[in-house]
């Protein structure tokens, strides 16, 4: 069981960006909006991200970096941080998953898990 002091929940909304995609060149652009909510008992700062992006052909790309969209937000108890970003894939369908490294104000380092979510061109899945 995880420690209730360090409870970060991540929710994701995705969308296909037809105007930024070039299907004839196997270029499919997607945007995602992520909400990181602190349901724990201690404020926590989002230090870094780790993404595992898998396209429909099984190709895997890992992305690591500081913060999210240039920020390392401190998320208070009961508060949330929402941001939008995007990715380009070479297939109509893929998944993303990963984690955020967090640092609570009491000094504890912990990971907030980002459950797998699907990116798909509308109509690509039956």
Curated annotation (Swiss-Prot):
Residues 2-126 form the ApaG domain. GO terms for biological process: error-free translesion synthesis. Gene3D superfamilies: ApaG domain. Disulfide bonds: none annotated. Pfam families: DUF525. InterPro entries: ApaG_domain, ApaG_sf, Uncharacterised_ApaG. This is Protein ApaG. It comes from Pseudomonas fluorescens (strain SBW25).
